[in-house]
Amino acid sequence: MKFNHYIIKGQNLTELQAQQDGILSAHPQQQVAFKRYFLPDNSLLRQLPAEEGAVSHIIQPVLCEGSVALWLVLCEGFRVRYQGCETILEGEGFRLIVTASLTCPDGTSEEQTRSIFDAYATLLQGHGLTLEGNCVRTWLFCDDIDHQYAGLVKARREFFAACGLTPQTHFIASTGIAGRPAGQPAAQPAGAGTPSFAETREYAPSGVPAPAAARAAIVQMDALAVEGAFTQRYLYARTHLSPTYDYGVTFERGVRLDASGHHATLISGTASIDHKGNILHEGDVAAQTRRMWENVEALLDEAGDAWSNVRMMLIYLRNREDAAFVKPLFDERFPDTPKVFLHAPVCRPGWLVEMECIASA
């Protein structure tokens, strides 16, 4: 079981495709397990090739290095099958199912999220799997996150509870971040006086629906499910991070997966937070970056991993201009780690930066 992660960046899709072709030619024994394109807007969609399997497209503008990027995951040692929006990887005694770009473009963010999880549960059922028993990682993208995320959170919490995913059992490692489903118009701005996610903290609002004539996808999900000879261990780092349910959300901070003598540690979206759920270093993006690293390191330590095993990073910034401060910090500490900086506001306005990563050995 082997995975290689590549972050490819370019000024246009032609550059991206040329780099991808070079990587694939250099590794003919490897097959594509997953792709995610990070796009500045919808103008490039017609230039993208038609591709089968788990291929994700999200509007999250690339900062600093080019205007488009691709997270490419190659695998070796699997039988690979592409089926609709899924890539199915079969090994000896285990199976991985990667799903991409699930949307249900009708209704509020709450209604769309519920429909997406319904659809995903149905897909898993077709493989003889369940959300609660087999899904280990999700990525949830939410347009107009400051006003639409509350509905997403409410729907996910209620759906999980109905599946038996509670504080007494476990949740699923996840990133919840701003991102517009590709091909969709921007979400209609919330009306004056509409409470934001950060203002409510009770997550009561269900999101603001777009006008009937302009229904569009607000929420998109990618996911990973596993079956068979895997052991999984959820990560908490309670000395540094609070349980997510303390502030009303329902995901795990990370998960370590082991199979066939290999392991992967999937770290969820992580920001500058303390063990009581408070934002640390408000207004100081450099200090938030350092605390974020400290939190991620605590999770890696708990997994028995280290920065030296990290194979890729995604870094999300609320403010475009902060890339000029954050990128040099990452480049100095992690000069050789594949990474990309994206304009994607975090779920609370006070958080200026968030990151996720994958470690393996």
Name these PLM-found stretches:
Residues M1-A361:
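N-terminal presequence-like segments and the immediate start of the first folded domain
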